[in-house]
Amino acid sequence: MSEMQPRPNDTLTRHMLYPFGNASFQAKSPPMLIEGGQGVYVTDASGKRYIDGQAALWNVNVGHGREEIKQAIRDQLDRLSYYSLFGGTTTAPPVELAAMLCRMAGPEGMVRAFFSSGGSEANEAAFKLARQYWRHAGEPQRHKVISLKRAYHGVTLGALSANGTQAYREHFEPLLAGFIQVETPHAYRNPFTTDPEALGRLCAELLEREILYQGPKSVAAFIAEPVQGAGGVIVPPANYWPLVREICDRHGVLLISDEVVTGFGRLGSMFGCRHWGVKPDIMVFAKGINSGYVPLGATLMNARVADAFLTPDEAEFTMAAFWHGNTYAGHPLACAAALANLRIVEDEALDRNAAEVGAYLLARLKDVQTRHPHIGDVRGLGLMIGIELVRDPETKEVFDLKRGFGARIADLCRARGVLIRNLADTFIVSPPLILERQHADTMVDAFEAAVAIVERE
């Protein structure tokens, strides 16, 4: 630890309970205080600069300190800081943003947007849309939601119930009834096959089998991330998503694409589902929608879903309305930031940059893997990459987590000016989409040096 910058004092933890944080650990090892950011870099309290290899939390896609976004927020703040979307009022930014989102997701058939304050809330809205859609469609018994094992959809109770990782769930059980998980197509860790096409087909068949077991007339929706994020960057086989769309169509099940991480270019295509050529019924966004400058989430729907809410009942207060909303839904500052952010994404073709630089970064990391046997797998798409350490590359046996190899490597990378996030012994590489090859080289060199040190220890 001698290579690390001095940690801030305990004032950073005395009154703060951090997300997913162990208060006892953080009392001894307070978090690093980030005080500045520009482009792909952030700066700590000592003035040391780091490549932000995690885009904060998968979300600062256009980079830190973008003047276009700051100016958009200032301009909107001068006009109107906040007003609600309730009670027959609205503001211009969410109206303009809804139109822009529906244009961008036009190839997927999206026609309406509903706003919230982040990804968990946006997924809650998706579940409520799905359930109320089926009530309007005359099938109120369709209430179940199927998701994948290892999935992450958020921390609110509905989103948590759709999560497929037990660690997120166990403290809060019993969770909501009607949420079911099926096997995820994890090429590196599955009990079935090493053939990607066979795996995609088998996992799709397991989904269909579960729909049939539950009773198709009881299933409202299937939700999945195009590439699983917090589950370890799990890239499905190419045939999986098209097969899922066919199965959902066959049984009338709504398909929800959770694009909170993958949306707006991270995978090298504007949306994750677009990479697979699949058109969902509902799409969920947050994070990259405005690169985290102001909290925002959005839930988009196609005409099938949206038209169900155009009922003959034209009363202002009616059970036909969508009975859901948040105080800060469509916040004008957040939406103004999103409009500026998405113009940058389109004008600078950041989806294409993610594809090109991401392929280069992935190839370099795979080359590192050939020299370090404890790197069991390197996987990813675009600028969304996972690196998994194993004790035994043949059996894929994991290290004892108490030894903290992943955290040690992340700390050594930090000492070399690179921030990457470790989830136990899997590393998440998800930098801003403006990353250049020179930044990728610095990241890879720091990571390999850190791995080499830990191997010798």
Write out the residue ranges for each language-model feature.
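Conserved N-terminal phosphate-binding loop of PLP-dependent enzymes in the Aspartate aminotransferase
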Residues: 2-457
